[in-house]
Amino acid sequence: VKPTDNLVMIDDSIVRGTTLRQSIIRILDRLDPKKIVIVSSAPQIRYPDCYGIDMSKIGNFIAFNATVALLKDSKQEHILTEAYNKCKAQENLPKEEMTNCVKDIYKPFSTDEISKKISDLLTPEGTNAEVEIIYQSISDLHASCPNHQGDWYFTGDYPTPGGNKVVNKAFINYIEGKNERAY
């Protein structure tokens, strides 16, 4: 790799970003590229999964953490409080009456803005190369897998009412500082 080269790496998905931050980006940076581009074949994972994959703690997701950071940077933390209050108001409703209140926190920002913040958060201090993380879009995911619409951890559109209950509980746990599963 020459110092004028861009280095592209493909990842199947980026959930927490820990491995990227703690090792992969550092290893790639030692090759001295001008830029490191990490392409995720999955969209940003924003919501917990409650149908088989153990991704129940929303505070572990880098897309969520990037969005929280953007809300703080733009002095819009009130959106977190409003979403929390909506979740709490629905907490004892039958799950069929619940809605995904966590979607509200993502509304102020574009996918590109969140991706840029993820890149910033996952770039280790002392990295020489520019780091850019690019995610698959939801529309392109649907085009590539037209017969499989299992996209709830990207969109928050759960296929059952229990999904809304889980996402709201995961957010309540996050705001209340409870490091426990939402189900």
Predicted regions and their residues:
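PRPP-associated nucleotide enzymes
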Residues: V1-Y183
